[in-house]
Amino acid sequence: MKEAQEEAAGSQTNLLQGTLDMLILKALALGELHGLGVARRIEQITRGTFQVKPGSLFPALHRMEESGWLTSSWGESENKRRAKFYRLSKAGQRQLAAETAHWRRISLAIASALAAG
């Protein structure tokens, strides 16, 4: 049983690597956030299923900003510290729509496979 749980935990990590961009885009589609706010929002919208570590989050935010999917500006966080705030760009909105459609197709296919007799 423990081995199956460890395997499931490893699978969750692999799934997160494949979905991190989509989760970041979705979190920011709900409003501007600083980096740690993005991590908190992802945890909220996935009901605690995904907890993004800073070592994964910040390189992804940087890469997505370089790709033109996000824009950013410096501001002050709720605890009065300087923080970089991220917003979804038009290109990011298009990317989110494409990734959402892709994951809906995958979800339907997996649900269909699991329901097969």
Language model: regions and residue ranges:
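Short, Lys/Arg-enriched N-terminal segment that forms or immediately precedes the first helix
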Residues: 1-13
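Amphipathic alpha-helical dimerization/coiled-coil segments
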Residues: 2-3, 93-117
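N-terminal helix-turn-helix DNA-binding core of bacterial DNA-binding proteins
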Residues: 12-58
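Short, contiguous hydrophobic alpha-helices characteristic of membrane insertion segments
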Residues: 13-14, 68, 116-117
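A cross-family signal for key residues in well-ordered alpha-helices
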Residues: 26, 40, 62, 97, ...
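Conserved RNAP core-binding helix
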Residues: 58-60, 65
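Beta-hairpin "wing" of winged helix-turn-helix
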Residues: 65-82, 87
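Accessory beta->alpha helical hairpin/"wing" motif in late/C-terminal subdomains of nucleic-acid enzymes
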Residues: 88-92
